[in-house]
């Protein structure tokens, strides 16, 4: 019975695929939708086709555009995306077999491309400013006008031009048809991020680059690297090499300053910033224990074995010296103005269980919240010396600090 059902399912699937293969392609270009939805998209009444690969051109239309290396890189990328294959060579089923050797149906004939009476020859790109700084205030605005025979793209910066190129690529349909229209667009939010947890799951560089590509297709602009946590410490600190030597999964599962610089350059070429998170004061054991000692003999971690997240010895001046040294290396590797300090899942019971920390709290007249605030202020002072804005992952810090705190992400980020 199982075999019969499988055969019936296979026959049904074959029939469905054959029906798709024999369907006639749409000759009148539909209105392609852009993702994310633009602020304004006005469709025209005419439709035409992109010129062939050897004739279509992106044109840097003003001196700022002509001098922009990131823009020229983006034009090369999007030309490759648009012209992955010529329409005449396309098949509507990727798994058909031209020689009929493996599957039971041949490839359908290539789609018939109508006479190209309206042909888009160029996309002229103009950028208003040569400034290539990428920050929270960077403009990503653009205006895209598709009018035959030449389209135009105007942007304040090269990063706005990148967003416009992405929209243009989405407008081109598989048969290279495109409809006249105008798009006026700007991001609703200046900070549009995804987070990758490279402590729990070390990710190879090619995979991170593929993730950055996917972000650029969705016009996202911040990669948040949760780079350290309990499972591993993959960041190679030049001043504290023992951290990754002892804390990484192995010597191959690390991110050296050279690797990070490569990722940041790859991201910036796509209009994406990279910010780092080193989660403190919890989520530090065992990866932050460079000598493999926990408890009373540790000069870095508190003795609270019942609380597996691990906590720093916030009572010791040496802890802040250690953090200052580490953050100096972090700021060199990650030049962005925003740095995430974690701060989630803190538990007062851990510090109360540590004899040394409990003694410090008693001497200072601190309760758990007071100690949290003390640590936060000390850490924020260190971060400020690096000319960085701080970003935390717990609402608890926001209860202890002034409203000048840059941003607070609620627990559960």
Mark where each language-model region is:
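Positively charged n-region of N-terminal signal peptides that target proteins for export
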Residues: 1-3, 274
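Acidic, contiguous N-terminal accessory segments
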Residues: 4-12, 17-190, 390-401, 405, ...
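A residue-level signal for conserved active-site and pocket-lining positions in enzyme catalytic cores
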Residues: 58, 274, 383
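Generic short alpha-helical hydrophobic face used as a protein-protein interaction/packing hotspot
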Residues: 62, 219-220, 278, 345, ...
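A generic structural signal for well-ordered alpha-helical segments enriched in polar/charged residues
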Residues: 80-84, 88, 170, 265, ...
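Feature activates predominantly on carbohydrate-active enzymes
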Residues: 130-321, 327-340, 354
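Active-site neighborhood of glycoside hydrolase catalytic domains
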Residues: 303, 308-399
């Amino acid at each position: 019975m199982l075999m019969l059902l499988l055969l019936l399912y296979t026959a049904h699937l074959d029939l469905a695929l054959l029906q798709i293969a024999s369907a006639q392609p749409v000759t009148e270009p539909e209105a392609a939708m852009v993702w994310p939805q633009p602020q304004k998209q006005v469709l025209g009444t005419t439709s035409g086709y992109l010129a062939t690969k050897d004739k279509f051109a992106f044109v840097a239309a003003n001196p700022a555009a002509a001098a922009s290396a990131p823009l020229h890189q983006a034009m090369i990328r999007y030309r490759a995306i648009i012209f992955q294959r010529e329409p005449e060579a396309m098949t509507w089923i990727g798994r058909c077999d031209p020689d009929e050797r493996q599957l039971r149906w041949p490839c359908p004939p290539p789609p018939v491309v109508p006479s190209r009476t309206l042909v888009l020859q160029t996309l002229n790109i103009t950028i208003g400013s040569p400034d290539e700084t990428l920050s929270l205030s960077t403009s990503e605005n653009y205006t895209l006008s598709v009018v035959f025979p030449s389209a135009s793209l105007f942007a304040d910066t090269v990063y706005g031009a990148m967003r416009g190129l992405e929209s243009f690529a989405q407008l081109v349909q598989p048969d290279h048809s495109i409809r006249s229209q105008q798009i006026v667009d700007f991001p609703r939010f200046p900070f549009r991020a995804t987070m990758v947890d490279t402590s729990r799951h070390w990710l190879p560089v090619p995979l991170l680059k593929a993730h950055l590509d996917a972000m650029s297709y969705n016009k996202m602009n911040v990669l948040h690297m949760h780079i350290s946590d309990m499972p591993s410490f993959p960041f190679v600190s030049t001043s504290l090499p023992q951290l990754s030597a002892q804390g990484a999964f192995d010597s191959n599962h690390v991110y050296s300053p050279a690797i990070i610089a490569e990722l940041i350059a790859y991201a910036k070429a796509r209009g994406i910033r990279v910010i780092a998170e080193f989660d403190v004061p919890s989520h530090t054991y065992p990866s932050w224990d460079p000598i493999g000692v926990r408890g009373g003999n540790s000069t870095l971690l508190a003795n609270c074995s019942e609380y597996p997240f691990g906590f720093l010895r916030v009572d010791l001046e040496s802890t802040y010296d250690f953090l200052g040294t580490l953050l100096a290396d972090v700021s060199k590797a990650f030049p962005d103005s925003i740095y995430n300090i974690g701060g989630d899942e803190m538990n007062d019971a851990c510090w109360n269980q540590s004899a040394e920390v409990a003694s410090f709290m008693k001497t200072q007249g601190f309760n758990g919240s007071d100690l949290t605030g003390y640590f936060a202020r000390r850490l924020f002072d260190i971060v400020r010396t690096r000319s960085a804005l701080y970003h935390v992952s717990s609402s608890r810090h926001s209860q202890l600090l002034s409203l000048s705190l840059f941003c607070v992400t609620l627990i559960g980020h």
